[in-house]
Amino acid sequence: YLYQTLGFPAPYPDPQENKREVCELNPDCDELADHIGFQEAYRRFYGTA
């Protein structure tokens, strides 16, 4: 895709985005992520990030 107004390619999708969304849907994981960061919060709730 191209940004319509800027004329350059869109950035590559974040490979962690799916895991970030899973963590955001869990209120406890989301709250912990606010304090210690997404990757560490995800690891504590779901295993390896």
Swiss-Prot record:
InterPro entries: GLA-like_dom_SF (IPR035972), GLA_domain (IPR000294), Osteocalcin (IPR039176), Osteocalcin/MGP (IPR002384). Its main location: secreted. Gamma-carboxyglutamate residues are formed by vitamin K dependent carboxylation by GGCX. These residues are essential for the binding of calcium. Decarboxylation promotes the hormone activity. The modification 4-carboxyglutamate is found at E17, E21, E24. Signal peptide: none annotated. It is found in: Secreted. Ca(2+) 1 binds at E17. Ca(2+) 2 binds at E21, E24. GO terms for biological process: biomineral tissue development; bone development; brain development; cellular response to insulin stimulus; cognition; glucose homeostasis; learning or memory; negative regulation of bone development. Residues 1-47 form the Gla domain. Disulfide bonds join C23-C29. GO terms for cellular component: cytoplasm; extracellular region. GO terms for molecular function: calcium ion binding; hormone activity; hydroxyapatite binding; structural constituent of bone. Ca(2+) 3 binds at E24, D30. Keywords: Biomineralization, Calcium, Disulfide bond, Gamma-carboxyglutamic acid, Hormone, Hydroxylation, Metal-binding, Secreted. The modification Hydroxyproline is found at P9. It comes from the Eukaryota. Belongs to the osteocalcin/matrix Gla protein family. The carboxylated form is one of the main organic components of the bone matrix, which constitutes 1-2% of the total bone protein: it acts as a negative regulator of bone formation and is required to limit bone formation without impairing bone resorption or mineralization. The carboxylated form binds strongly to apatite and calcium. This is Osteocalcin. It comes from Notamacropus eugenii. The lineage of its organism: Eukaryota, Metazoa, Chordata, Craniata, Vertebrata.
